[in-house]
Amino acid sequence: MRSKHNELKSPIMSCSKRTEWKSILGPLIFRQQMILTQNLNQKLKTIKACMYQIRKLSKLKALYRGL
């Protein structure tokens, strides 16, 4: 019982514990990156759509100025 208590206090984890954490965190980090990438792609599409609308409005504005 005493050795387990000391093991928990030790800042250095055993190799197997580190591997466990990596195997648990790896998929979570990957999933989080995928979600962030999807969000960024969606925002990029929105920005592109807005820029397209701005260009259309600018052309209309130029046409009205020409009248």
UniProtKB/Swiss-Prot annotation:
Top-level taxon of the source organism: Viruses
Family, per entry: Belongs to the rhabdoviruses C protein family.
Other remarks in the entry: The P gene has two overlapping open reading frames. One encodes the P protein and the other the C'/C proteins.
Function per UniProt: Seems to stimulates transcription by the viral polymerase. May play a role in viral pathogenesis or transmission by insects vectors.
Name of the protein described by the UniProt record: Protein C'
